[in-house]
Amino acid sequence: VVRDAFAKLGHNAVSVDFLPSETEGKHIQGDVLDVIGSRQWDLMIAFPPCTHLAVSGARYFAEKRADGRQQEALAFVEALLTADIPKIAIENPVGIISTHIRKPDQIIQPWMFGEDASKKTCLWLKGLPPLMATTVIKKKRYANQTPSGQNKLAPSPDRWKIRSKTYQKIADAMATQWG
């Protein structure tokens, strides 16, 4: 979504992931740590997996620390943040990056960009300004919430992928403001 928003504005945008791209466009299927050192990049917007980092999985933190998964995830984020790229944004939900690496530079919500949704998202920035809200929608409850305020997406094999998707209007704001 983010790659496509930048490409739509004429940028030479490339996505990198172990998974294949779900849309047409420039995509490298592989390890981003191998790719970022392969050439000069001017901007990286990274979305590291939140599986071992987000507070939504806090009940499993002891197990993840004991077997090293959490330390490995933090080392990956640190490698992304310290990459030799002048402009970097790292996106992740509220989690342990804030306590183990550093606090986020900004916390955004989809409703700040015209989306009828709530999803507290942290941004760690290097060489980039905070995103400016575009169209703010304030509600007591958003379309993706239950009456108690929880995410209403039912459990499913691809729930992780659906919940991790970047909202289009946030991607558009990144492209117009950082591109």
Question: What is the predicted role of each segment?
Answer:
Residues 1-179:
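Conserved active-site and SAM-binding loop architecture
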